[in-house]
C-alpha cells in the first residue's frame, strides 16, 4: 500500500476532518476549516499536550495571552527588523516564490544532496546556486528571476478608527512573546521558583509566500509552546531533557521511531535568538518536515524586553542570594502540523480479502486518546433503537460517541474504521435478553460480549496514555 497525500487529503475532506476554507466562494488560498471530526481530533491533540506538559508536569503552568500586543513587543523581539523570507519573482509569468524553497524542491527532485541547510545561506549563495544549476521557475519553467529581496512575514492591521502609523498593530507571528512579557506576572502569582515553565496554546499568523502541502504550512496556524526558564549554565541539561520529553510524547501517541528523526540546526541556520536548536521531523508522504523545534533561546528574549521596556525582568534566587536573567528552553510545536502527522501515521489500507473476493479496508489507527469518536453505538436493527439509544446516552456522558443505525452492520463498521473509531458497540436482539452488547476492536476486528452495566468499567482505561 502506497501512502500518498492525495489519498489522505481525499479521505480527510470526505469524512469531515478538514474542508477547504470559504469553499462556496471559491476558497481562499491555503486556508482550511476543521470539520466535525477534525475539530475533535485537534482538540484531543491539544488536550494531550496540555495534560503532559502542563497538568501533570510539576514544573509548568499555563497562560492564554492576547493575539494583539503593543508594537514595541515586536521591536524588542526582533520580528519587525529580522523576521523575513527571501523572495524572488519570475519575470516571465510574474509568480513570486521563496528562493530557499525553490532550491530545496529542485535539489530533492534532482537527487542533489545539499551539504548544509538552505536556511543558513546568504542571498548571494542562493542566487549562485540558482544560476549554476539553471533552476527553472516552478510555474512556467523559464529561467528569468529578479534579484532576491527580504519580505517581512508579519500581518499588519490597525487598531481604532483611523488607519495611520500610530494605530498600527500586528497579528502575532508566535505565541512565545506573550509568555515573555508576562514572565514576572506569572512567576509572582504562581509562586514558582526557577526552574519552571509557562505553556500556551494559541493562534499565530505568518504571511508566508509559499504555503502548501495541505495543512502543513498555512498563514494562520495554531501553536503549542512552552517557555522553560532555567538558571544560566543549566540550559544544556534542560535542552536535552525537553528534547527527549517531546520525542517520548510523540511515541506515546503512536508515532513510530522510524517515522521521525532529530535534526540539529547548523550554526549558519540558527535563528537570531538561538544558541542551539533541534528539530523533530516527521516523514510525511511528501518528505521530511519539521514538527517540533526545541531551541535554547538563552536570555535573549528577557534581555531584549528588559532593555526596550525599561522594566526589571531579572529573577532573584534566594538560595544563592543573586539576581540573573533566566535562560529559556523553548519546545515549540505546530498543532496543525502534528495533527497532520497523526493523520498520516494512522492512515492505512489493509488487504483483508481473499483471492476469490478481494477486499481492502481503509482505516485510521489513531491512538484511542486522540480518536475523534471514541465509541460507535450501532443497533443491529432499527427496531432496537430505543434500547440502543439508552446505551448511547450512558456512554456519551463520558465519551464522544456516534450513533449510527443506517446500512448493514458491516458497512457501518467500515465507516467507523475510516474515521478511526477504536471501538464499536453493537446492540442486537440477544441484548434484549442477556443485557449484553458486542464490543468490536478497530485494530484487531475481534469482538467480545460485555454486560451493559459493565461498559463503564470496561472502557475506563481504554483511552489513557
From Swiss-Prot:
Its EC number is 6.1.1.14. The keyword Oxidoreductase does not apply. Pfam families: HGTP_anticodon, tRNA-synt_2b. Its main location: cytoplasm. This is Glycine--tRNA ligase. It is found in: Cytoplasm. One of its GO terms (biological process) is glycyl-tRNA aminoacylation. Gene3D superfamilies: Anticodon-binding domain (3.40.50.800), Bira Bifunctional Protein, Domain 2 (3.30.930.10). CDD domains: GlyRS-like_core, GlyRS_anticodon.
Amino acid at each position: 500500500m502506497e501512502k500518498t497525500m492525495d489519498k489522505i487529503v481525499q479521505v480527510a475532506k470526505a469524512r469531515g476532518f478538514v474542508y477547504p476554507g470559504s469553499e462556496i466562494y471559491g476558497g481562499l488560498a491555503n486556508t482550511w476549516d476543521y470539520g466535525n471530526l477534525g475539530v475533535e481530533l485537534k482538540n484531543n491533540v491539544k488536550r494531550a499536550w496540555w495534560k503532559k506538559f502542563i497538568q501533570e508536569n510539576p514544573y509548568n503552568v499555563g497562560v492564554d495571552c492576547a493575539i494583539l500586543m503593543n508594537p514595541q513587543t515586536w521591536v524588542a523581539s526582533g520580528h519587525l527588523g529580522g523576521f523575513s523570507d527571501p523572495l524572488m519573482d519570475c519575470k516571465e509569468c510574474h509568480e513570486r516564490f521563496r528562493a530557499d524553497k525553490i532550491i530545496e524542491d529542485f535539489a530533492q527532485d534532482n537527487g542533489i544532496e545539499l551539504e548544509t541547510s538552505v536556511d543558513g545561506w546568504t542571498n548571494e549563495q542562493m542566487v549562485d546556486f540558482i544560476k549554476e544549476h539553471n533552476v527553472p521557475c516552478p510555474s512556467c519553467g523559464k529561467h528569468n528571476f529578479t534579484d532576491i529581496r527580504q519580505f517581512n512575514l508579519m500581518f499588519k492591521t490597525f487598531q481604532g478608527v483611523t488607519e495611520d502609523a500610530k494605530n498600527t498593530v500586528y497579528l502575532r507571528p508566535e505565541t512565545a512573546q506573550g509568555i515573555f512579557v508576562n514572565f514576572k506576572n506569572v512567576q509572582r502569582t504562581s509562586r514558582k521558583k526557577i526552574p519552571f515553565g509557562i505553556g500556551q496554546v494559541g493562534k499565530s499568523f505568518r504571511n508566508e509566500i509559499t504555503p502548501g502541502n495541505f495543512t502543513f504550512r498555512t498563514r494562520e496556524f495554531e501553536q503549542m509552546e512552552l517557555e522553560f526558564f532555567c538558571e544560566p549554565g543549566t540550559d544544556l541539561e534542560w535542552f536535552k531533557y525537553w528534547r527527549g520529553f517531546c520525542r517520548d510524547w510523540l511515541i506515546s501517541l503512536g508515532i513510530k521511531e522510524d517515522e521521525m528523526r532529530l535534526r540539529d540546526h547548523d550554526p549558519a541556520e540558527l535563528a537570531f535568538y538561538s544558541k542551539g536548536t533541534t528539530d523533530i521531523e516527521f516523514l510525511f508522504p511528501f518528505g521530511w518536515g519539521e514538527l517540533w523545534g526545541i531551541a535554547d533561546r538563552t536570555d535573549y528574549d528577557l534581555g531584549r524586553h528588559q532593555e526596550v521596556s525599561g522594566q526589571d525582568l531579572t529573577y532573584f534566587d534566594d538560595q544563592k542570594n543573586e539576581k540573573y536573567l533566566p535562560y529559556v528552553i523553548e519546545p515549540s510545536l505546530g498543532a496543525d502540523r502534528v495533527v497532520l502527522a497523526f493523520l498520516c501515521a494512522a492512515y492505512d489500507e489493509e488487504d483483508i480479502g481473499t483471492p476469490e473476493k478481494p477486499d481492502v479496508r481503509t482505516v485510521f489507527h489513531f491512538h484511542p486518546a486522540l480518536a475523534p469518536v471514541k465509541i460507535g453505538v450501532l443497533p443491529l436493527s432499527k427496531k432496537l433503537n430505543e434500547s440502543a439509544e439508552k446505551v448511547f446516552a450512558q456512554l456519551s456522558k463520558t465519551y464522544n460517541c456516534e450513533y449510527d443505525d443506517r446500512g448493514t452492520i458491516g458497512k457501518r463498521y467500515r465507516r467507523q474504521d475510516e474515521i478511526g473509531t477504536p471501538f464499536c458497540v453493537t446492540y442486537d436482539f440477544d441484548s434484549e435478553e442477556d443485557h449484553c452488547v458486542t464490543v468490536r476492536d478497530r485494530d484487531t476486528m475481534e469482538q467480545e460480549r460485555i454486560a451493559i452495566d459493565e461498559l463503564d468499567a470496561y472502557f475506563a482505561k481504554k483511552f489513557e496514555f
